[in-house]
Each structure stands twice: as structure tokens, then as C-alpha cells.
UniProtKB/Swiss-Prot annotation:
Mg(2+) 2 binds at residue 67. The gene is ruvC. SUPFAM superfamilies: Ribonuclease H-like. Its cofactor is Mg(2+). GO terms for biological process: DNA recombination; DNA repair. This is Crossover junction endodeoxyribonuclease RuvC. InterPro entries: RNaseH-like_sf, RNaseH_sf, X-over_junc_endoDNase_Mg_BS, X-over_junc_endoDNase_RuvC. Mg(2+) 1 binds at residues 7, 139. One of its GO terms (molecular function) is DNA binding.
Length: 181
């Protein structure tokens, strides 16, 4: 299975492509899509949409995984990030890809084994898990991390998270990937 991971951002959007063969992960590509900070917002969003659409047609992934938005202290920054995510998701959907979303906590737990890991720890584990010769940039590393998260059973985590309301009615919840009462 070929997975396209995305770390969305208005200025810089990271991407990472990997393949899962059984339990083995194979690095395919990574990099960034940059929008012109001097351009108007619609032009920047179109740059992201076009860039992601091109990635989909170039790498032909089976699915995509994307990091969820966190609420920032600055509401304007959160709004802009949400718009960037929207453009990216539309680009992914233009290729009819299934899109899976993961929180930073889920990503860190899947990659490092600790949900409060810092960016350097995530970057180092991405290098180790994919046998990379050098460190990818921070945005590309996060994108590879979200792809690794999906490859390591993220589909199950996403499905369980989607069941949260039904589980809560039964007095259950998901904690650290397990059902608890």
C-alpha cells in the first residue's frame, strides 16, 4: 500500500510518500510545497491545491493521511491553517483518495511511542524507521510521520475515534489505543 502523508501549512506544506509491504516501510519521496507569502490568500490556497493534486497524479498513492488542526492561541492563525487544510484535502479528494486524519498526539504515539515527544524525537525516529541517510526537513518529517502513523494501524485508531460518541453512551472510551470502562 502506498501512503501519502501531509503536514498542512499555509506557508509550507510537507509531504511524504512511503510504501508498506507487510510490516516493512519503504521510503519513496518527501519534500514541501511552498506558497508565495506575498500573494493573496486565494492564490496561496490554489498553489497548495495544485501542488497536492500533482503529488497525487505523480505518486499514485492508495490513500492519504493528514495531520488534524490544533487550536492555536491566535484565532487568525487557526483559521488560516484550516483554510490551508481545506485546500489540501480538496487536492487529495480530486484524486478520489480515502483521507485519514490524525492528531499530533496520535502521530507521536505511533512514531515515537510517546504522545508528548518533541519534533526532534519524531524526526529522529522517522530517519530510523525509514532507514534514511539524512534528516528530512521538519515539515517533510512530520508528513512522513503521519504516513507512518497510518501504516502502523492508524486506520484502526481513526475508526475507534469515530466511534467515540457511541462508546461514551456505553460508558466506554478509547485510551492509549485501548477500550477502557
Amino acid at each position: 500500500m502506498r501512503i501519502l502523508g501531509i503536514d498542512p501549512g499555509l506557508r509550507t506544506t510537507g509531504f511524504g510518500v512511503l510504501e508498506r509491504h507487510g510490516h516493512k516501510l519503504v521510503y519513496v519521496a518527501s519534500g514541501t510545497i511552498k506558497s508565495n507569502g506575498n500573494a493573496d490568500l486565494p492564490s496561496r490556497l490554489k498553489t497548495l491545491y495544485d501542488g497536492v493534486s500533482e503529488l497525487v497524479s505523480t505518486y499514485r498513492p492508495d490513500c492519504a493521511s493528514i495531520e488534524k488542526v490544533f487550536v492555536n492561541v491566535n484565532p487568525q492563525s487557526t483559521l488560516l491553517l484550516g483554510q490551508a487544510r481545506g485546500a489540501v484535502i480538496c487536492g487529495l479528494m480530486s484524486g478520489n483518495l480515502p483521507v485519514f486524519e490524525y492528531t499530533a498526539l496520535q502521530l507521536k504515539q505511533a512514531v515515537v511511542g510517546y504522545g508528548r515527544a518533541n519534533k526532534d524525537q519524531v524526526q529522529e525516529m522517522v530517519v530510523r524507521l525509514l532507514n534514511l541517510e539524512g534528516k528530512p526537513g521538519a515539515d517533510a518529517s512530520d508528513a512522513l510521520g503521519v504516513a507512518i502513523c497510518h501504516a502502523h494501524g492508524g486506520e484502526t485508531l481513526a475508526a475507534m475515534a469515530g466511534l467515540a460518541p457511541q462508546l461514551a453512551q456505553k460508558g466506554l472510551r478509547v485510551r492509549r489505543g485501548r477500550l477502557v470502562g
